[in-house]
């Protein structure tokens, strides 16, 4: 089961406008309508640096194939992940509720549900289980976890801390909340979108496109 938690945050919408106004040696204690207008202006004209003074920290659990899409976002973000070099507890594997078809006119994304017979679904279950059995056998034979992990599938669940600026996470969501994003990745991005919007409502309103 995938999971997204907001662990920590630094700053508020007011922090962003105060970072912008310091250029004129001014700050405010209470957020008002003028501050909203300033945030809107900063976002529309891509003055990104004030938004880098506010940040979010998430803990995320998702399958490897989702994590490897999201880790491509590097600017303004840092990532620390569970390492199978150091741990060898039993892996958890992701299993989809349904299968989606290949789209007709695109190299990415997916279409409607594809019905598979029980044999194929059984083969998937068996293959995943075989990977876990082989992994455990290698460990029992004394193989190092850093090498034994090579037999684990991309459906293996992983966890990571993901921290970054409000601006950086808005860029993630602007790309990964789109309909043509892989659904599983989109599911993670949609939760980030919701939590970030609650933490920084005005910044998020104008940074999200």
Show where each model-derived region lies.
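Family-specific signature for flavin-dependent thymidylate synthase
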Residues: 1-209
């Amino acid at each position: 089961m995938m999971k997204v938690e907001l662990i920590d945050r630094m700053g508020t919408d007011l922090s962003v406008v105060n970072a912008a106004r310091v250029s004129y040696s001014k700050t405010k204690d209470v957020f008002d309508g003028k501050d909203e207008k300033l945030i809107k202006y900063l976002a529309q004209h891509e003055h990104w640096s004030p938004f880098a003074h506010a940040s979010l920290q998430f803990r995320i659990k998702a399958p490897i194939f989702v994590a490897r899409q999201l880790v491509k976002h590097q600017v303004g973000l840092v990532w620390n992940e569970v390492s199978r070099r150091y741990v060898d507890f039993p892996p958890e594997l992701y299993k989809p509720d349904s299968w989606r078809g290949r789209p007709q006119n695109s190299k990415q994304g997916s279409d409607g549900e594809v019905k598979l017979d029980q044999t194929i679904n059984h083969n998937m279950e068996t293959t995943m289980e075989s990977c876990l059995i082989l992994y455990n056998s290698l460990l029992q034979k004394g193989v190092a976890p850093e090498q034994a992990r090579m037999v684990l599938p991309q459906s293996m669940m992983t966890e990571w801390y993901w921290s970054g600026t409000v601006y950086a996470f808005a860029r993630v969501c602007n790309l990964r909340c789109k309909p043509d994003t892989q659904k599983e990745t989109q599911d993670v991005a949609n939760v980030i979108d919701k939590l970030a919007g609650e933490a920084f409502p005005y910044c998020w309103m104008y940074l999200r496109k």
